[in-house]
Amino acid sequence: MYKVLIVEDDPMVAMINEQFVSRHKDFTVSNKCSDGKSALEYLEDNDVDLIILDVYMPYMDGFETLRQIRKKQIPVDVIMVTAANEREQLKEGLHLGVVDYLIKPFTFERFKMALDKFITQAEALKDLERVNQKTLIF
């Protein structure tokens, strides 16, 4: 089961995201944080597989949070959530290695597609690691 951290400053959206994650059999919510700073603090002591990360938050926006995650070399995948469908934001997120973008408002089906995309990429990476290990043995 994949562990998910939800980082969202709007309590209602955080609750909806938690419900959407819980509806997917392969995921569990490990924690919710209301801003990037508290998310970084949580990640210091806890491992998660995926972060659902809002772009617009107080104190530290989602992009700065993601830059700090990458700088600290925390091995985690990220799905960004934003209310704005701006090309520059999308490019910046892709440059920082996000798995997918969710543009508010989104449906459960769209949310599930993003989670399934994460699973596909995570499983492909595991397969690649297994192949590399077998190659090293021979």
Task: State what each model feature region is.
Residues 32-41, 62-65:
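Helix N-cap/capping motif at the beta->alpha junctions
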Residues 46-52:
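Active-site beta3 strand of CheY-like receiver
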Residues 63-74:
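Short amphipathic alpha-helix used as the core "switch/output" element in two-component signaling
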